Amino acid sequence: MAKKTKKAEEITKKFGDERRKALDDALKNIEKDFGKGAVMRLGERAEQKVQVMSSGSLALDIALGAGGYPKGRIVEIYGPESSGKTTVALHAVAQAQKEGGIAAFIDAEHALDPAYAAALGVNIDELLLSQPDSGEQGLEIAGKLIDSGAVDLVVVDSVAALVPRAEIDGDIGDSHVGLQARMMSQAMRKLSASINKTKTIAIFINQLREKVGVMFGNPETTPGGRALKFYSSVRLDVRGNTQIKGTGEHKDHNVGKETKIKVVKNKVAPPFREAFVEIMYGEGISRTGELIKIASDLDIIQKAGAWYSYNGEKIGQGSENAKKYLADNPAIFDEIDHKVRVHFGMTEDDSPVQSELVEEKNEADDLVLDLDNAIEIEE
C-alpha cells in the first residue's frame, strides 16, 4: 500500500513539473512576443496600491473611499442642469495642476467660462482646451492626449454634446437611432486600455434624459448608451439641494447652494456614499465650510454655542467668521485637513486600500513560507 502511494506521488509530482515547465515556456514566449509584463502573477505587481488624486473636495474624497479619483480609470459625473457638474470637474482640474500635473478640457458644449474656471483655482494659462466640431473629433483628440502619456487628467464636457458627424452633416429631423451610442461604445473600447496604461484620469460629464412611457421606477437615464456606465470605475450623481442665504447686507440674496454628490458606482471602494458640499456662486466648493463641518463632527474643532475653537483657541463666532479665519490662516487649515484625512485613512501611509493590500500580501507571503518549510521538512 505504501509503495502504491509513493508511486502515485511520484507520478503526480512528475505531471506537476511538466505542467509548470509548459507554463514557464508559454510565459517566456508571451513575454518575447508582447513584452515584459504582458502576463504576470497578481502578487508580483510592482504597484499594488490604488493611486488616487484628490477631487479638490474633502467631503467628496471621503465619500469616494480611496481618498480621491482613482488614476487610470474612467469617471462619469452626471446630474440635472445647473447642479454643479462642471464645477466639480473644474475642481479636479485645479487639483491636478496643484499637484504639478497637466490637465486637458474637451469643451464639446462650447460653454466653458475662463473667468469662473480661474476663480476656482484653475491655471487657465496652462489648461489645454479643445472645442471640437464633432463627437468623433473630440474623442479622437482626447485619445491622442491620453496616448501621449503626458496628460494627467482629461475632462469631456459633455457626452450629450458629442454629436456624431453624420448627425451634424444631416438635416434637422433626420433619424440617427443609436449613432451616438455606437460612437461612445467604440471610443470606450479604444480608450479604456490606454487610460489604464498611462494612469490618466478621464472624467466624462453627462446630462440627464427621461425615458418615455416609464410608469414605474426611475425614468431618468443618461445619453450616450450603456458603454460609459460599464467602463466607468466611478459614477457620481450631482444634485443641488437647498439655497444658501447670505449674511449681513446679502441676507436676502442666495449666495450658493448645498449640493449632494452620491457615489452610485465605485469599483475601488464601497459605493452609495454621499457627500454634501456648499457650492458658492462665483467661488465653487467652499473648502473651509466643508472642513469646519466635518472637523466639528469629529470634535477636531470644538463648537460651543455659536463659537468655534481649535486647540483651545477661539477661531470665530458663527460659521462665516470661522471660515474667514481658516481662509486667512492656511497653515491651520492644512493642519486640520491633515488630521481629518488621517482619521479617515486617506493619507499615503494610512490608505485603507493600501493597508488591505499589504495585509493580503503578507498573508500570501506567510503561506508561501509555510509551504516551503513543509517541503524542506518532508525532504
UniProtKB/Swiss-Prot annotation:
GO biological process: DNA recombination; DNA repair; SOS response
SUPFAM superfamilies given in the database record: P-loop containing nucleoside triphosphate hydrolases, RecA protein, C-terminal domain
Location(s), subcellular: Cytoplasm
Name of one Pfam family that matches: RecA
Highest taxon of source: Bacteria
Main location: cytoplasm
CDD domains: RecA (cd00983)
Residues that coordinate or bind ATP: G79, P80, E81, S82, S83, G84, K85, T86
GO molecular function, one term: single-stranded DNA binding
InterPro entries listed in its UniProt record: AAA+_ATPase (IPR003593), DNA_recomb/repair_RecA (IPR013765), DNA_recomb/repair_RecA_CS (IPR020584), P-loop_NTPase (IPR027417), RecA-like_C (IPR049261), RecA-like_N (IPR049428), RecA_ATP-bd (IPR020588), RecA_C_sf (IPR023400)
A cellular component annotation (GO) from this entry: cytosol
Keywords: ATP-binding, Cytoplasm, DNA damage, DNA recombination, DNA repair, DNA-binding, Nucleotide-binding, SOS response
Keyword rRNA processing: no
Keyword Chaperone: no
Family per record: Belongs to the RecA family.
HAMAP family membership: RecA
Function recorded in the entry: Can catalyze the hydrolysis of ATP in the presence of single-stranded DNA, the ATP-dependent uptake of single-stranded DNA by duplex DNA, and the ATP-dependent hybridization of homologous single-stranded DNAs. It interacts with LexA causing its activation and leading to its autocatalytic cleavage.
NCBIfam families reported in the protein's UniProt record: tigrfam_recA
Name recorded for this polypeptide: Protein RecA
Gene: recA
